[in-house]
Amino acid sequence: MKLAILGAGAWGSALAIAFARHHQVTLWARDAEQIRQLGEERVNRRYLPDCPFPEQLKLSSDLAEAAHDAELVLIVTPMAGLRPTLKALTALDAPLPPILWACKGFEAGSSLLPHQVAEEELPADHLYGALSGPSFAREVAQGLPAAVTIASDHAEFAASVARELHSPLLRLYANDDLVGVEVGGAVKNVMAIATGVADGLDFGMNARAALITRGLAEITRLAMALGASPQTMMGLSGMGDLILTCTGALSRNRQVGLKLAEGKPLQQVLEELGHVAEGVATAREVLTMAERLQVDMPITAAVCGLLYQGHDPQQVVDGLLRRSPKSESGGLLD
């Protein structure tokens, strides 16, 4: 399969390395100097310094060249880059291939999910979907086993892409609940910040398990309010992604929580991180949406208080753990 991967950050580079083992891949970035450097060094030294590019991986800063004859375009930018990239693609004087995105989050200001942004920018009958699931870029680039989801409202399209790109080391599963997959992929980043704070304060593994489980309940309530299936939250893009992001040492959002627990201000944390942590921007959008839909999301509210209102990390987590008891008989809906 001929692929164009748009975005040469950590995840874009990792997917390009992984898919180039079995497919024709062109990795695109807007910055011509970045592409020149990547081409000369044949490695993304900033994000994946120990993961060299395969010889067959092509590089380009020309969007038309990268997308030419591609059978599939995969957009791997931060959420803020999705709409501009879609606009640039639709402006090309060429047929538009089917599109997947690996962006996770809600658009700042509009609170739109990725597929809602795509609906505004792509032709009504265009094939599109999301790639999401528990996957750290470094491990995928190193060829370690992983499993992710291809989600689309067009079930046959999702199944076809999953079959084409599936490999023993990167297993792909199709899902027709696009909303559920996107919500799971977005909100788990908020929960990872909370879990990172608890870990940083040495609250212990019991507290971590409680936050992850109740975080899953929050994600499920919001997803259902948006029309998703609760079953999706039990899959790779729900529980799977949540567990990895809340516990993995490579999780950027968990690192944000760990650093906040040290008493560092948010701006310093983000500067030290040097990477995009989508949960920071997503938290505010999620809370706004939850309030509009009247969905109870106490962990999200606590994270927003920590990020934007200067609340003390110790008091934030302690307050969550001291909330009034309630029945769990209704499962994830309570």
From Swiss-Prot:
Q: What gene is this protein translated from? A: gpsA
* GO biological process terms held by the UniProt record: carbohydrate metabolic process; glycerol-3-phosphate biosynthetic process; glycerol-3-phosphate catabolic process; glycerophospholipid metabolic process; phospholipid biosynthetic process
Enzyme class, broadest EC rank: oxidoreductase
Q: Which family does it belong to?
A: Belongs to the NAD-dependent glycerol-3-phosphate dehydrogenase family.
The protein's matches in Gene3D superfamilies, at most eight in alphabetical order, are given as: N-(1-d-carboxylethyl)-l-norvaline Dehydrogenase, domain 2, NAD(P)-binding Rossmann-like Domain
Designated name of the protein: Glycerol-3-phosphate dehydrogenase [NAD(P)+]
Q: Which HAMAP family match?
A: NAD_Glyc3P_dehydrog (MF_00394)
> Which UniProt key words apply to this protein?
Cytoplasm, Lipid biosynthesis, Lipid metabolism, NAD, NADP, Nucleotide-binding, Oxidoreductase, Phospholipid biosynthesis, Phospholipid metabolism
- So, what pathway does this thing act in? Membrane lipid metabolism; glycerophospholipid metabolism
Q: Where in the cell is it found?
A: Cytoplasm
What are the record's GO terms for cellular component?
cytosol
Sum up the protein's function in the record's words: Catalyzes the reduction of the glycolytic intermediate dihydroxyacetone phosphate (DHAP) to sn-glycerol 3-phosphate (G3P), the key precursor for phospholipid synthesis.
The entry's active site is: K188
The main location class comes to cytoplasm
What is a single Pfam family found in this protein's UniProt entry? NAD_Gly3P_dh_C
Q: Which residues of this UniProt protein bind sn-glycerol 3-phosphate?
A: K104, G133, S135, K188, D241, S251, R252, N253
Q: What is its EC number?
A: 1.1.1.94
* Disulfide bonds, paired cysteine numbers: none
Reactions catalysed: sn-glycerol 3-phosphate + NAD(+) = dihydroxyacetone phosphate + NADH + H(+); sn-glycerol 3-phosphate + NADP(+) = dihydroxyacetone phosphate + NADPH + H(+)
Give binding positions for NADPH: W11, R30, K104, A137, R252, V276, E278
* SUPFAM superfamilies xrefs: 6-phosphogluconate dehydrogenase C-terminal domain-like (SSF48179), NAD(P)-binding Rossmann-fold domains (SSF51735)
Report the GO molecular function annotations.
glycerol-3-phosphate dehydrogenase [NAD(P)+] activity; NAD binding
User: Mind telling me which NCBIfam families this protein's record contains?
Assistant: PRK00094.1-2, PRK00094.1-4
InterPro entries given in the database record: 6-PGluconate_DH-like_C_sf, 6PGD_dom2, G3P_DH_NAD-dep, G3P_DH_NAD-dep_C, G3P_DH_NAD-dep_N, NAD(P)-bd_dom_sf
